[in-house]
Amino acid sequence: MTRMRSLAVLVLLGVARVAAADDAVLFEARAGVATAGAAALSWSPDAALVWVENDESPGPLGVAGRWSYLYYSEATDQARVYSVRDGRILAAENLDMKFDAPPVADDWIDSGRALSAAEAAQGDAAKKAPRGALRAMVLARGTMDATEPDRTTWTLVYSTPGAPSTFVVVDAASAKVLRTWRG
């Protein structure tokens, strides 16, 4: 669990690497799962999806031009990440770190619905204190909900120049906002 949280912090702090989507076809996160999943199963027959994150700036509908899908093989105790853009894999590489990585639940809501839930919950608070620009959307299990560590969640990260980032955690099954904080 500690390794997974460390990975979450590293990834969420690395949102500065997010680039513009240029002319890529924008798509919600779930649309790339079949492509990445087929490659992951050829890499390891027991590969399980453990992490999804935008690789390029997410748009206002929860879409991005490129998404990363991290798979973990319990049999080999290895993780491999696939970056999907325009329906094909642009990059695939093994991660050289060891961590416990529980698979995300199968019934997760897509990125657009997660963003809608986060935006709706922010409502009046957003009018008083702007959230800034959406920089990252991360789907994972067991990283951002201490009360229910088995829960799959979306974590949305907004950045504002000169202010701490805003984090919004959305239950990936019910689309309910679980918590929001700045930090």
Model-based region annotation:
Residues 20-183:
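Long, terminal "pre-/pro-" and other extracytoplasmic accessory regions
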Residues 9-13:
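Gram-negative bacterial Sec-dependent N-terminal signal peptides
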Residues 1-8:
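Bacterial N-terminal signal peptides that target proteins for export
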Residues 15-18:
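N-terminal signal peptide c-region/cleavage motif recognized by signal peptidases
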